[in-house]
Structures are given as structure tokens and as C-alpha cells.
Amino acid sequence: MKAGNLGINSPCTNHVMPQCNPDIEIGNEEIFEFKGLKLYTYKMPGHTDGTVVYYAEIDQDKVLFTGDFFFPYGERGEFASTGWKGDLSYSPEKMTQSFSRLYDMKLNVNLVLSGHGIPLFGEKAQDLTRVAFKYHILNNR
């Protein structure tokens, strides 16, 4: 962001972004607290170098916000995708490492909210990381 890597000279025409300074730089495994709600951040490079997922426990729900790292698709969210692979910092190796790390964390989520697709609840939410990891392995050899 600070370097303006995705600025007007970027070959990625749909990612034009001027140089800017973030208010807060998110590190790995930081916790932000808002009125008693703890939001855990985990860097998951691969889709981009800056990909982050968020985890929170809200009431009885264990919620994972995946952004563009992976997301469900299909009418009922029965499939998963890792999305666009055209970013300058896309790395299948880093994505594999990130998936392995997330899978090993065993967050046992019951709600997944992503940057695309429908929200997934219950068993489908719990299984989405595995389904997306499998999609990644089969489509990024």
C-alpha cells in the first residue's frame, strides 16, 4: 500500500490504487478488541501477499471471515474456490502453506462469511476449509 504497487502503473487494470498510508498495519495473529468483541487476525498469504482472515466468537457463533482467500459457490455453497489468480503477488506455494496452517488451527467454525458467495452455517461452514483446500490442490499443480 505504501509503495503504491497497485497504482496507475499497475498491469492489473482492475486493481488501480493510489499510494496510501494505512491507519493500522495488521500483523500476524493480532487481536483487536471492540466493546468486548475480540477479533483475531491471521495473515494467509497466497491469493495476495496481504491476504488476511478474521476470526471472532459472536454470541454462540464461531465466525470466520475469509475475504477472497477462499469462498463457497454453487446454489447451496456446495463447492469452493480460491478465486482469481492474476494478482502480482499470487503464490500457490504460499497459499498451500496458508491452507495448511488454517486447517491445523482447528477453529471449528460454525459460520463462514467470505468476500463472495453465500454465508455458510453449521457443518457446511466446518467443512468449507477442507473443500477449498482440496480445490486449491487440484487446481494449482
Where is each model-derived feature located?
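Acidic/polar short surface loop at catalytic or gating sites that assists cofactor/ion binding
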Residues: 1-21
